[in-house]
Amino acid sequence: MQPTLLDCACDLPESDWQRLAANDPFISRAFLGAAEQTGAAGEALGWRAMHLALRDDAGRLAGLLPLYLREHSFGDFSRDWNWAPAWQQAGRDYYPKLVSGVPYTPSPGPRLLAGEGADAAIPAALIAAAIELV
C-alpha cells in the first residue's frame, strides 16, 4: 500500500472520504473541504492541508489521516506558545509541526480512519507515512 498526499479534502470523491469518516461531522469531507476551499483553513492562515490517503492493491481507499502542517499556533485551541521558545532554547525547531486535528475546532474523535473490518496494519502504515513527512 502506497500513501498519497492530498492538498485538499476535495481531492478525494466525497463517497470515498465519507466511507471512512462515517458520521463525524468535523472530519467530513464537506466540513474540511469547505474550510480549505474558502481559505479559512489554508496556507495563508497557517493550515496547510497534507492529508494522507492509503489505497489497497485494488486501488480502493483503505485508510485516511487528515493532517495539517502548522507554522504557528494562531487559531489553535491549545496554546503551546511557551513550548515553542523552550524547544528552540533546547536547540530544536518547534515549527513546522504536523497535526491531525480539525481547524479551529476542539472536537474529539478518530483521526486514523480505516474502513470497517480493515487490515490492522493500516493505522500503522498511516503513522509511518506521517513520520516520513516530518
Q: Where do the protein language model's features map onto the residues?
A:
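N-acyltransferase acceptor-side catalytic subdomain
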Residues: 1-134
